[in-house]
Curated annotation (Swiss-Prot):
The gene is tmk. SUPFAM superfamilies: P-loop containing nucleoside triphosphate hydrolases. The lineage of its organism: Bacteria, Bacillati, Bacillota, Bacilli, Lactobacillales. GO terms for biological process: dTDP biosynthetic process; dTTP biosynthetic process; dUDP biosynthetic process. The keyword Nucleotide-binding applies. Belongs to the thymidylate kinase family. This is Thymidylate kinase.
Length: 211
């Protein structure tokens, strides 16, 4: 049986990774090399989707930063056990829209929480499981925010309402993660047209997992 793998898509808000994932999977499915599962964080399974609704509710303005982090971690654990691990055991290629790096970038760099604590919580929730590959879609914060504001189909969530400074910190957190994990994280310029970004992501995956 083909070994299951985890590929995560990361990036600041407005990077377009969700749109990239849709097109990327279509290209990979045409190759018919491995069964593909796509999922997201927070969410992916019923319990985690319920937690997602709490986290992103625009009315929950009083949410403490540590509460926010712990909710993400709880959603991550349930999602991993209920969906990701069974998919890996079945030899599938699992694409996750956000995973452990989001917590470091958003709650660590963005919120200013202790990154060592976050890394410990990530390891606790995942039993130390890391992605086989992370595609980091990078875009300047101003462009990302402009994209969010222009997307009439996007449902605005609590994190979208943060000021520019928060988005800039998150981006910086991601760039630092890329420097610290060059073997796992591949940086992709997401300011380019969607088709170009999809092609680049496809190329990276094919090169990384060439038989």
């Amino acid at each position: 049986m083909t070994k299951g793998k985890i590929i995560t898509l990361e990036g600041p808000d407005g990077a377009g990774k969700t749109s990239v994932l849709e097109q990327l999977v279509l290209k990979l499915e045409k190759d018919n090399e491995q069964s593909i599962v796509t999922t997201r964080e927070p969410g992916g399974v019923a319990i985690s989707e319920s937690i997602r609704n709490i986290i992103l509710d625009v009315n929950n303005t009083e949410m403490d930063f540590k509460t926010e982090l712990l909710l993400y971690i709880a959603a991550r654990r349930q999602h991993l056990v209920e969906k990701v691990l069974p998919s890996l055991s079945a030899g599938k290629l699992v694409f996750i829209d956000r995973f452990i790096d989001s917590s470091v970038a958003y709650q660590g760099e963005g919120r200013g929480l202790n990154k060592s604590d976050i890394e410990w919580l990530n390891d606790f929730a995942t039993d130390g499981i890391k992605p086989d590959l992370t595609l980091l879609f990078d875009v300047p914060s101003e462009i990302g925010i402009a994209r969010i504001n222009q997307n009439v189909n996007r449902e605005i969530n609590r994190l979208d309402l943060e000021k520019l400074e928060m988005h800039q910190k998150v981006r910086q957190g991601y760039l630092e993660l890329a420097k610290a994990n060059p073997d796992r994280i591949v940086l992709i310029d997401a300011s380019k047209p969607l088709d170009d970004v999809v092609d680049e992501a496809y190329r990276v995956i094919k090169e990384r997992f060439a038989h």
